[in-house]
Structures are given as structure tokens and as C-alpha cells.
Amino acid sequence: TIPDLITIGVFTALYFVLVAVATLFSSVALMGFGMILLPAVAALICGCVYMLLVAKVGKFGAISVMGIVVGLFLFVSGHFILSLAASIVFPVIADAIARAGDYRSKTGILASYVVFCYGLTGPILPLWFMKDAYVASLQARGKDSSYIDGVFAHVNTGTFFIAMIVVLVCALLGGWFGQRMLKKHFAKTGII
């Protein structure tokens, strides 16, 4: 419905703002690892927005649309097609998980949020799986070899697994915090 689409649009905009904050924080505070850990930082701070979206809309498609809009933005802004693919696949799976619990199961919604958070790994996956294309992309944008070496300084199999585990932990914490805020503050004020 139109009100649902407006709600999805508002929460997607809020999600974008929080991802921008996560980007700024990770690039300043996590020198050298900022890009690799960006999805984890975003997972940590975006739980409230996700939980509010699920509580307000509670229908299949809301989570998927938010993820797809993010993926389209990433793709249009110059990221690889892998960004778009991850931003479609993970949110649709997350939507299906939340739907399985009728958008009411706390555990199901938390699991859904964890899966959704992996959608934001799309921009960093090419670091490990499309290195040559990533290097060519950086060279095409005029980046010199020292910059490129800096980008790949911490990229190895170990950091891939560490990054994915940190996303899991941060998504669990961010989702748990979002659920607590939903119950403690938003439900009492009548927002949901």
C-alpha cells in the first residue's frame, strides 16, 4: 500500500544516514581496516531502524525493498554488480526468515537482521573475489600503486573470515539493542 511504501522510504533514508555515519566512523577510527569492517559497524548501529521497519510494516517485501534500494544506490555509485547481488539476495532471505515467524518472533526477526546485514558486504566482497577487476577499477579512477597497495594491505583469507564473523557479532548486538529500544522506548510512546 502507499502508506507502507512511504514508511519503507522513510526507514530506508534513515538506514542510509546511519550507513553514512558508519562509513565516516570506520574510515576515521579504524584506519586500514575501515572498509573491511564497515558492514560490521553499520550492523551495530542500524538495528533500531530495522526493528522499527519490521514492527511498522510487518509484511513481506519491506525488508527486500530496503535492501534492493541500497543495492541499486551502491551499483549506480560505481560499485561492482556483486554489491547489487548481495543487496538483493540477503534482504530477500531476511524477509523470508522474518515472514516465517509472521514478523512477530523475536528470534526470527533477530536472525533476519543478521542475514540482512550481510547484504552490505557486497561492496567489500570484490576485495577477495574480484581482486584484478578491483585493481583495474582503482587504476581507472587514477589511483596510484601505493594507494592500491594500502587498500589490499589487510586483504587475505584470514581477514575475510574475521570480517564475516565481526559482522555476525555486531549484527547480533545491534539487533538485540534495536529490539530492546523497540520494547523499552518506541512501544511505550506509541510509535509502534
Question: Where are the regions that the model predicts?
Answer:
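Cytoplasmic juxtamembrane interface segments
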Residues: A86-F116
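Membrane-embedded alpha-helical hairpins and interfacial helices in multi-pass inner-membrane proteins
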Residues: M35, L110-K183
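Hydrophobic transmembrane alpha-helices
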Residues: T1-G61, V65
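Interfacial aromatic-anchored transmembrane helix boundaries in multi-pass membrane proteins
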Residues: T23-M31, M35, V70-A98
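Membrane-interfacial segments
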Residues: A22-L30, V57, G61, I81, ...
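Membrane topogenic helices and adjacent juxtamembrane segments
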Residues: T1-S27, L138-K143, Y147-N156, I162, ...
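Alpha-helical transmembrane segments of multipass membrane proteins
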Residues: F11-T23, C46, Y50, L74, ...
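Hydrophobic alpha-helical transmembrane segments
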Residues: L5-V10, A40-L44, I63-I68, I81-A85, ...
